[in-house]
Amino acid sequence: MKIRDAYTIVTCPGRNFVTLKIVTESGTHGIGDATLNGREMAVAAYLDEHVVPALIGRDAGRIEDTWQYLYRGAYWRRGPVTMTAIAAVDMALWDIKAKAAGMPLYQLLGGKSRERVMTYAHCTGQTIEDCLGEVARHVELGYRAVRVQSGVPGIETTYGVAKTPGERYEPADSSLPAEHVWSTEKYLNHAPKLFAAVRERFGDDLHVLHDVHHRLTPIEAARLGKAVEPYHLFWLEDCVPAENQESLRLIREHTTTPLAIGEVFNSIHDCRELIQNQWIDYIRMPLTHGGGITAMRRVADLASLYHVRTGFHGPTDLSPVCLGAAIHFDTWVPNFGIQEHMPHTDETDAVFPHDYRFEDGHFLAGESPGHGVDIDEELAAKYPYERASLPVNRLEDGTLWHW
């Protein structure tokens, strides 16, 4: 099962996606997601210049060996660009192997650990009342879990909140980074009020999640975690910048609120101490940025030893290829927690036809061989790349801060 061809496809059906397609001599093909939000062309260039030439002629069935070749052989290890490129190759090779075996990916991984995959929706609003309306709408759609974000009084732009009701939230909206103003004090005073309102309106049975998006210092995060304990959050996500793993120890010592982190991680070494010391409850590193299925199996296996569960990052800046592969992984992995779900646009779904489906607050993996997602290259070509950048944050005094 030699690799005959490999190439990248860059398309923008509403937002940019990078896809790697690998074709074997028998004609079987697999695809992998190589999207890195705001740095898409860096990964595409890495693949085109350094990875694709090395794939031609290799045995597509030797997934582990290829992963090690791309990781160890590069010398410059880890980092988001390298690991996203490796993940795309890995995802495509698992797709090919499952197709060759004639089985859906979850079967090749070891079979089902569950019948369906619980997801959480994003519920936002400029005001708490607007957010509550979105929660009600998603509960009607069958969701048992929601991530809630609302505008903070006195802050013009708040992370995760669309500019107008019903609009999709898309932070990468200009060719150069937009600058937003952030106030930790105003946020900390406001956030508990949001959770109190959700619990008062919807009771205790609904799973409630919240994303801080790396904005706080460790002691500020500890204060927030303690303050929201009465509202029994499913998790508090990315409450501090991810580089300082020791900060999670301090937060853990101050609060029983479950902690989730990892969407900007790229390697098992980014989360090893967090898992082994049980400073977190959920690991969120996505397949696309964490080195693919091969690497994330190792992360999940390690996490299972310490009662840490998966909660994969799943926004619309990762393509349906990543989501499809993640749903198969979620269906198999024993220590599954939850899967993020932000619906893609109709244009994106048309470019990436898939057989996974959403039903009553859950995803169901498809039964076709592989991960069940393909790409319509002719349609993809109609949506050329459009440069876009994520915003940056400044404090009210002008100091650059974490976005």
Swiss-Prot record:
InterPro entries reported in the protein's UniProt record: D-mannonate_dehydratase-like, D-mannonate_dehydratase_GalD, DgoD-like, Enolase-like_C_sf, Enolase-like_N, Enolase_C-like, Mandel_Rmase/mucon_lact_enz_CS, Mandelate_racemase_C
The species this protein was found in: Chromohalobacter salexigens (strain ATCC BAA-138 / DSM 3043 / CIP 106854 / NCIMB 13768 / 1H11)
Protein origin, superkingdom: Bacteria
GO biological process: amino acid catabolic process; carbohydrate catabolic process
Site annotation Important for activity and substrate specificity: residues: P315
Cofactor(s), by name: Mg(2+)
Family per record: Belongs to the mandelate racemase/muconate lactonizing enzyme family. GalD subfamily.
Lineage, opening ranks: Bacteria, Pseudomonadati, Pseudomonadota, Gammaproteobacteria, Oceanospirillales
SUPFAM superfamilies: Enolase C-terminal domain-like, Enolase N-terminal domain-like
EC identifiers of the protein: 4.2.1.-, 4.2.1.39, 4.2.1.8
GO molecular function list: gluconate dehydratase activity; magnesium ion binding; mannonate dehydratase activity
Enzyme active site: Y159 (proton donor/acceptor), H213 (proton donor/acceptor)
Any matching Pfam family: MR_MLE_N
Residues binding Mg(2+), per UniProt: D211, E237, E263
Function, in words: Has low dehydratase activity with D-mannonate and D-gluconate, suggesting that these are not physiological substrates and that it has no significant role in the in vivo degradation of these compounds. Has no detectable activity with a panel of 70 other acid sugars (in vitro).
Catalysed reactions, semicolon-separated: D-mannonate = 2-dehydro-3-deoxy-D-gluconate + H2O; D-gluconate = 2-dehydro-3-deoxy-D-gluconate + H2O
Cofactor note: Binds 1 Mg(2+) ion per subunit.
Keywords attached to this entry: Lyase, Magnesium, Metal-binding
Protein name per its UniProtKB record: D-galactonate dehydratase family member ManD
Lyase is among the record's keywords: yes
Annotated NCBIfam families: ManoateDhtManD, PRK15072.1
Effect caused by changing P315A: Strongly increases activity with D-mannonate. Slightly decreases activity with D-gluconate
Binding-site positions, substrate: N37, H122, E263, R284, H313, D317, E340
